[in-house]
Amino acid sequence: MKAKRRFNIWLWVLLCVPCLLASCDHNVHDGEEESGLSVSLTWADEADQGTEVKDVKLWIFNADDGSLVEEKHYGSAQEVASQRFALPEGHYQILAITNLIEPFFTTDQTRALTNWNNIQIGLTNPKDVKHNAYFGVTDVRIDNKEGNYVVQNPVKSVLAELTIIIENVPKGTEMSGKALDAAWCLFPTQKNSDGEYGLPSIKPTEVEMPTILATESTLQSEVIRLMPTIQGSPASHVYLRLLLPNGTLQEYDITAPAMKVGGKYELRLNYNQMQPKMNLEATINGWTNLNNEVEIK
């Protein structure tokens, strides 16, 4: 989805800039015979622009009683944008999830989702996830005084992303490990402690990290995608194993700030300064919240 900053009376296009969850534009399709509600997906995080959208699932719920009004499945964001929903007057909440393909799943995929508060996004296998899924929640009030409504729904990544970099390691060192307290699932329609949609479960799961071989003096993992830290925990915990070329096994227990929904993080360490137990704070070198380095325009 590419950024566009305006649309005309005949063609409205996707906006790829952050916007308010409750934003709603009127009269976008004035002059057209068909009226109703249309949904425009946008990127909440500018860093996600350019991500291919392969699959979109959309649910519209009655915000007053939580009942399901519409459930749709699309192949692209453009298909979503072209759909119009003829809805009676009322208050509605909209959930969109993109790229919800293996290993991602939602609650009870064999039947329709009928309860707004119980929707879950999970992973059939949390190890070595190659792509992210994205979700967005917004609401709209329909009063039928205007014939056409366009609601913009910003989507953000479900999983946190972590990159581990260790400098000055002996060449041939192998790194493996696991994240100990990633959430088992995410409730996309419930708000977290920051007041944002996306509440991690209380139930944890361990996420095994792929084994990486240091071919040079710097060992760098690929992006590790995992569920955010469990609900209520102020910290995340990472267990690392380094197998040196001489067969020595070294183990490290690392405590770092909690990983949030859609967060992007970098753990950078110097092998010569590593200790069996390390407590990293957000204010010191070693743990970097990459979200703070992404310019939001």
What label would you give each PLM region?
Residues E52-Q109, E174-V261, N292-K297:
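Tryptophan-paired
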Residues K2-W12:
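Bacterial N-terminal signal peptides that target proteins for export
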Residues H26-Q49, I166-G172:
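Short amphipathic, basic-aromatic surface patches that mediate peripheral association
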Residues Q152-L159, L226-G232:
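Conserved "repeat-terminator" motif of extracellular CCP/Sushi domains
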Residues A81-Q83, Y149-N153:
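Short strand-edge motifs at loop-to-beta-strand transitions and within beta-strands
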Residues S76-Q78, E102-Y149, I212, N246-M274:
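Structured interaction patches on ligand/partner-binding surfaces of diverse proteins
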Residues K4, D25-E34, Q273-K297:
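Intrinsically disordered, low-complexity repeat and linker tracts
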